[in-house]
Amino acid sequence: MHFVYIVRCSDGTLYTGYARDPKARVKVHNAGRGARYTSGRRPVRLVYTETFQSVGDALRREMALKRRSRAEKETLIGRRRRRPS
């Protein structure tokens, strides 16, 4: 499985990325070994994930999300929270 994830940084900003294991990737971010963007904004908290079968689909979605505005990402995060389990 391949995942696109969004984390909320300690300063309230959002970071979007790709990972095979998003929970493990968040641990890497929080250890200061993740993306440069998140290293100075720790701790980060996982707030959104999407699952994909192919790496290509996941990377295309990651790029699409990175082009979205913060407001659009917040709406997406809010929708995911309201979905029934």
Q: For the regions a protein language model found, what residue spans apply to each?
A:
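GIY-YIG nuclease catalytic motif and its immediate N-terminal context
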Residues: 1-85
